[in-house]
């Protein structure tokens, strides 16, 4: 991107998280996108309701809730969270007060969705218990993010799932079955073109990878943090933050 701009005078608009490398380059003008407002959320929900993926009265219930719940509006601070909340709302036992609380409910809510919706046709292929499936998904997120991997072929998805099952001591389960459930039941990993699978959003991968690290023993956490610190110190661009 920088080379195209400097060598050919091409003006380029890019999107990025704040604080990434491109934000600190010379001749870059940074603009910050405003957080979405209540009216934006309602407009998105109206559009989502056209898919008829949930019951007809769900939209009005959410509208009513948004009018009196500022905390909920602040939680749904990006289109992704609005979409996920709309899908998950009929199956939530309680309304989340923060993005972190919402993410903590996300996998289980979607994994159990077929049990709670009468006309939901997809059945889980794997018979491992839901808490174990959650652990495997967290391990998959950790292993892939550790390898700087955000997308998969079908074969590599099966391989990462197999490795994640081994990390969780669930070797008896078929990787193909649990991978199917991650894609077709939770939809947190999605098909994207021919033989390509991606996480619904990078934040899904990041949150569940953090959950995996949180579940490690104290000694394993020490080893992991030591490896991260060493990696930072060996990376010139990051050494100042070590």
Spans of model-derived segments:
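P-loop NTPase signaling cores
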Residues: 1-113, 134-136, 154, 162-182, ...
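Short glycine/serine- and small hydrophobic-enriched flexible loop segments
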Residues: 83-90, 142, 211-214
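Short secondary-structure boundary elements
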Residues: 84, 128, 132, 149-152, ...
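Amphipathic alpha-helical elements of HEAT/ARM-like alpha-solenoid repeat scaffolds that form extended
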Residues: 85, 237-242
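A eukaryote-biased feature capturing mid-to-C-terminal, repeat/solenoid-rich segments of large proteins
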Residues: 95-110, 209-238
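Cullin-RING E3 adaptor/co-adaptor recruitment helices
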Residues: 120, 127-141
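C-terminal leucine-rich, beta-strand-based interaction scaffolds used for sensing/assembly
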Residues: 124, 149, 158-222, 226
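Polybasic, low-complexity association/targeting segments
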Residues: 140-155
């Amino acid at each position: 991107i920088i080379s195209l701009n400097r060598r050919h005078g091409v003006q380029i608009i890019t999107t990025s998280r704040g604080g990434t490398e491109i934000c600190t380059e010379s001749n870059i003008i940074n603009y910050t996108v405003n957080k979405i407002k209540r009216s934006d959320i309602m407009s998105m929900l109206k559009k989502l309701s056209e898919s008829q993926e949930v019951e007809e009265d769900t939209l009005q219930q959410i509208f009513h809730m948004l009018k009196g719940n500022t905390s909920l509006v602040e939680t749904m601070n990006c289109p992704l969270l609005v979409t996920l909340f709309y899908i998950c709302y009929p199956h939530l036992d309680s309304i989340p007060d923060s993005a972190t609380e919402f993410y903590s409910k996300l996998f289980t809510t979607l994994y159990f969705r077929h049990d709670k919706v009468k006309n939901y046709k997809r059945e889980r292929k794997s018979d491992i218990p839901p808490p174990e499936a959650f652990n495997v998904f967290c391990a998959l997120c950790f292993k892939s993010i550790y390898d700087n991997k955000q997308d998969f072929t079908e074969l590599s998805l099966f391989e990462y799932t197999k490795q994640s099952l081994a990390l969780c001591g669930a070797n008896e389960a078929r990787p193909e079955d649990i991978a199917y459930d991650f894609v077709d039941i939770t939809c947190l990993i999605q098909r994207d073109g021919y033989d390509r699978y991606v996480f619904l959003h990078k934040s899904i991968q990041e949150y569940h990878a953090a959950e995996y690290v949180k579940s490690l023993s104290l000694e394993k956490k020490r080893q992991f943090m030591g490896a991260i610190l060493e990696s930072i110190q060996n990376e010139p661009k990051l050494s100042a933050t070590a």
